[in-house]
Design a protein with these regions (language model features):
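Short hydrophobic alpha-helical segments of the AMP-binding
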Residues: 26-31, 37, 60, 137, ...
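Conserved AMP-binding/adenylation subdomain of ANL enzymes
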Residues: 138-155, 165-189
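Conserved G/P- and acidic residue-centered "switch" motifs that form tight phosphate/ATP-binding loops
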Residues: 34, 123, 179
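Nucleotide 5′-phosphate-binding alpha/beta core
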Residues: 4, 31, 54-113
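Residue-level detector of anion-binding/catalytic polar loops
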Residues: 36, 66, 181-182
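Conserved pre-ATP/AMP-binding loop-to-beta segment of ANL
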Residues: 92, 100-126, 131, 136, ...
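Conserved ATP-dependent adenylate/AMP-binding module captured primarily in the ANL superfamily
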Residues: 39-70, 76-79, 100-101, 140-157, ...
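Conserved AMP-binding/adenylate-forming
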Residues: 1-47, 159-162
Length: 189
């Protein structure tokens, strides 16, 4: 997987995937390998491809992403991004990561280590990155849980994509932390 590709602890890895099992596996795979996930929205509209490339190139360059995990269908976009991002060395699918085998050793983590980088949409300018440490993330999840009195009997329902901070933190990681059930829906249904 990522360690075999030379991923160093704290190195940024982009995830350009829709909400799916592959997203779950990729996000935690990056964390377990000691990397830093960088969520990106996948391309959806050809009419907005130039804007997509501009925003994503800015994010990938700013984060220093070395590996980008994406759908096989999005590889042409990923290759264009690779030509615009000097740090980007490898483009992989989630299936390539899964077929690489298990993790032999796990780098140690501290509460102050970066859990992931969340970027703004960039709708009014260049996307800006927010560093979330493991401690920040857990504090945020606990605060949200206290506000709604969340526990393991709750069923979390979300249509928000996992590359969105509320979909990722509030829905998925929140339900995981509180051992609640998570039901994911398409925003189109």
């Amino acid at each position: 997987g990522l360690l075999e590709q030379g991923l160093s602890p704290g190195q940024a890895v982009g995830i350009m995937l829709p909400t799916s099992r592959d997203y779950f596996f990729s996000f935690f795979g990056i964390l377990l390998a000691g990397g830093v996930p960088v969520p990106l929205y996948p391309p959806v509209r050809l009419s907005q491809i130039e804007d997509h490339l501009r925003r994503h190139a800015a994010i990938l360059n700013n984060a220093g992403v070395s590996v980008l995990i994406t759908l096989p269908e999005a590889r042409p976009i990923a290759w264009i991004l690779k030509s615009q991002v000097m740090s980007l060395q490898r483009i992989m699918s989630a299936q390539e990561l899964l077929s690489a085998g298990g993790l032999r050793s796990r780098p140690p983590l501290n509460a102050s280590d970066t859990a992931f980088l969340q970027y703004t949409s960039g709708s009014t300018g260049t996307p800006k990155g927010v560093v979330l440490t493991h401690d920040n993330l857990l504090s945020n999840i606990r605060a949200m849980g206290r506000a709604v009195d969340a526990d393991s009997t709750d069923i979390f329902v979300s249509w928000l994509p996992l590359y969105h901070d509320m979909g990722l933190i509030g829905a998925w990681l929140g339900s995981l932390y509180f051992s609640g059930q998570l039901v994911l829906m398409s925003p189109l249904s």
